[in-house]
Amino acid sequence: MQRILSSWFVQGMVKATSDMWLKGWDERNGGNVSLRLDAADVEPYRDEFYPAPRCVELSQPRTELAGCWFLVTGSGKFFRNVQLDPADTLVLLQITDDGMAYHIHWGLSNGGLPTSELASHFQSHAVRKAVSGGKDRVIMHCHATNLIALSFVLELDEARFTRLLWEGSTECLVVFPDGIGIVPWMVPGTDGIGSATSEQMKTHTLVLWPHHGIFGTGPTLDEAFGLIDTAEKSAEILVKVLSMGGMKQTITREELIALGERFGVTPHAGAIAL
């Protein structure tokens, strides 16, 4: 067995994708995850890399990520199968030094390419790497059921959507005080939706794709998963509350302000002002 299969990053991706599938967020080949790695992370496994790595040109240059390593889920791969065959469903790649292409060094053992949302991932990675000082390393996309459901019935206004999620569960303001960004419905797998998402990623760690899914970021796979899980739990509560006739009482503006002060976070200005 290849030693890389027991590496912390492959095992972490196996757990994350399995958890996401068990949550019901990633039907069939839905969803995609990418994890930015350091050269030191992959160095011990170089002897298991492909001797002649495939080179694939990027649709847009990513000079901000030149030389960076990523572990990414594969295009058309089912999350429920990652745990069964990580070497086929995952891919380890490195962006070239000029940022124009990437080399596939390991994975996709039966052929294929990284996720079709790779452009969106790289655009968001570039932004989050800059705004977090290199701390954020994960971009996670999934089809979180209740967040999608709310995108059909709530006004697609980031302040209002954020405020309702904060009110749906006390922990939400603490976990994502910067609120949730929203892009218009757009065709997936395009540079356009990637650009719109990365623009929202400048000020948000969560970005809603209406009628489609959610993008989340964080320093680790656990943090990104936990962020989405928290928002989705609140969305589930809101779906139930709305189906029961709506709120009769909720967390007030003053209480949300006090919550932010207690945990040392600054709430999204537009959402707290409502």
Swiss-Prot record:
<dbReference type="InterPro" id="IPR013447">
    <property type="entry name" value="Rhamnulose-1-P_Aldolase"/>
</dbReference>
<dbReference type="GO" id="GO:0046872">
    <property type="term" value="F:metal ion binding"/>
</dbReference>
<dbReference type="GO" id="GO:0008994">
    <property type="term" value="F:rhamnulose-1-phosphate aldolase activity"/>
</dbReference>
<comment type="pathway">
    <text>Carbohydrate degradation; L-rhamnose degradation; glycerone phosphate from L-rhamnose: step 3/3.</text>
</comment>
<dbReference type="InterPro" id="IPR001303">
    <property type="entry name" value="Aldolase_II/adducin_N"/>
</dbReference>
<dbReference type="Pfam" id="PF00596">
    <property type="entry name" value="Aldolase_II"/>
</dbReference>
<comment type="subunit">
    <text>Homotetramer.</text>
</comment>
<keyword id="KW-0479">Metal-binding</keyword>
<keyword id="KW-0456">Lyase</keyword>
<dbReference type="InterPro" id="IPR050197">
    <property type="entry name" value="Aldolase_class_II_sugar_metab"/>
</dbReference>
<keyword id="KW-0862">Zinc</keyword>
<feature type="active site">
    <location>
        <position position="117"/>
    </location>
</feature>
<dbReference type="InterPro" id="IPR036409">
    <property type="entry name" value="Aldolase_II/adducin_N_sf"/>
</dbReference>
<dbReference type="GO" id="GO:0019323">
    <property type="term" value="P:pentose catabolic process"/>
</dbReference>
<keyword id="KW-0963">Cytoplasm</keyword>
<dbReference type="GO" id="GO:0019301">
    <property type="term" value="P:rhamnose catabolic process"/>
</dbReference>
<feature type="binding site">
    <location>
        <position position="141"/>
    </location>
    <ligand>
        <name>Zn(2+)</name>
    </ligand>
</feature>
<dbReference type="GO" id="GO:0005829">
    <property type="term" value="C:cytosol"/>
</dbReference>
<feature type="binding site">
    <location>
        <position position="212"/>
    </location>
    <ligand>
        <name>Zn(2+)</name>
    </ligand>
</feature>
<protein>
    <recommendedName>
        <fullName>Rhamnulose-1-phosphate aldolase</fullName>
        <ecNumber>4.1.2.19</ecNumber>
    </recommendedName>
</protein>
<feature type="binding site">
    <location>
        <position position="143"/>
    </location>
    <ligand>
        <name>Zn(2+)</name>
    </ligand>
</feature>
<comment type="similarity">
    <text>Belongs to the aldolase class II family. RhaD subfamily.</text>
</comment>
<comment type="function">
    <text>Catalyzes the reversible cleavage of L-rhamnulose-1-phosphate to dihydroxyacetone phosphate (DHAP) and L-lactaldehyde.</text>
</comment>
<keyword id="KW-0684">Rhamnose metabolism</keyword>
